């Protein structure tokens, strides 16, 4: 399993991820990985991925989906998993090694500019594309990773109204605190930046994709082992 890295000039959003969010995400890995498995399971059942395929996993995070994809494509296939956070990638490498997976490569890079080879059958992202600083640049470069006939699937959050696990805590907080100012640091456009289907359709079309299809997924979400854990998680990562 290769551990080569791609060095990029980090944007302020990448800096925010590495300096602010990585320690929090690491602390609550049991929620951010375990709590999202139902979304992946519903999608993975129908992914057009088989033995021998070459796959990219964009914004791979802790690497759990990359490892699942590596098992799916088997020893004759390969997975290129890319993320901007070294700490996340280290978890992926360690977990892959522990599970005997050697057909996945974890790379540090900016998906918007990474020099993908146009040789992949499939490109996947779970809750990664919504944080692109330039969505069209990121989506276009994901398409550049695909060979003719390749397919891209991404999972993104719908509107906050459809996600009370974040929406309700935000409403409560705003009863007592003002919203963040314009100069507040952030991780980028945010988790709900791709909630508008019409807008995302245009982004995909501009990026060169053909006949985009949207599917609504409703799945349970674990937000903590117990009430105290859920509250601590929201205070750390929520509104």
Identify the role of each PLM range.
Residues 121-136, 158:
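A short SAM/SAH-binding and catalytic strip from SAM-dependent methyltransferases
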Residues 44, 67-70, 93, 136-143, ...:
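A structural alpha-helix within SAM-dependent methyltransferase catalytic domains
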Residues 74, 132-133, 146-148:
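Helix-to-beta-strand junctions that scaffold the AdoMet/dcAdoMet cofactor pocket
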Residues 34-53, 68:
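Conserved alpha-helix/loop element of class I SAM-dependent methyltransferases that forms part
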Residues 136, 147-225:
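Conserved catalytic/acceptor-binding region of the Class I
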Residues 54-114, 137:
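Class I SAM-dependent methyltransferase SAM/SAH-binding core
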Residues 112-123:
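A short acidic, Gly/Pro-enriched loop at the edge of an enzyme's catalytic core
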Residues 2-31, 213-239:
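C-terminal helical/coil "lid" or tail adjacent to the Rossmann-like core of SAM-dependent
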């Amino acid at each position: 399993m290769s551990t080569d890295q791609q060095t990029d000039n980090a944007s302020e959003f990448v800096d925010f991820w590495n300096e602010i969010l990585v320690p929090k995400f690491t602390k609550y890995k049991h929620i951010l990985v375990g709590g999202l498995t139902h979304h992946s399971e519903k999608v993975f059942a129908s992914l057009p991925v088989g033995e021998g395929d070459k796959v990219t996993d964009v914004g791979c995070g802790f690497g759990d989906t990359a490892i699942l994809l590596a098992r799916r494509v088997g020893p004759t296939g390969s997975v290129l998993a890319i993320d901007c956070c070294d700490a996340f990638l280290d978890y992926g490498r360690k977990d892959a090694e522990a599970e005997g997976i050697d057909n996945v490569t974890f790379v540090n890079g900016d998906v918007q500019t990474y020099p993908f080879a146009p040789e992949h059958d499939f490109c996947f992202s779970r809750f990664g594309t919504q944080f692109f600083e330039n969505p069209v640049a990121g989506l276009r470069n994901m398409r550049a990773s695909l060979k003719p006939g390749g397919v891209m699937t991404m999972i993104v959050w719908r509107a906050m109204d459809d996600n009370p696990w974040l929406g309700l805590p935000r409403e409560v907080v705003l009863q007592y605190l003002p919203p963040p100012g314009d100069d507040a640091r952030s991780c980028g456009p945010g988790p709900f930046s791709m909630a508008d289907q019409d807008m995302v359709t245009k982004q995909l079309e501009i990026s060169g994709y053909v006949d985009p299809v949207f599917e609504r997924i409703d799945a349970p979400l674990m937000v903590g082992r117990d009430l105290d854990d859920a509250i601590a998680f929201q205070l750390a990562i929520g509104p």
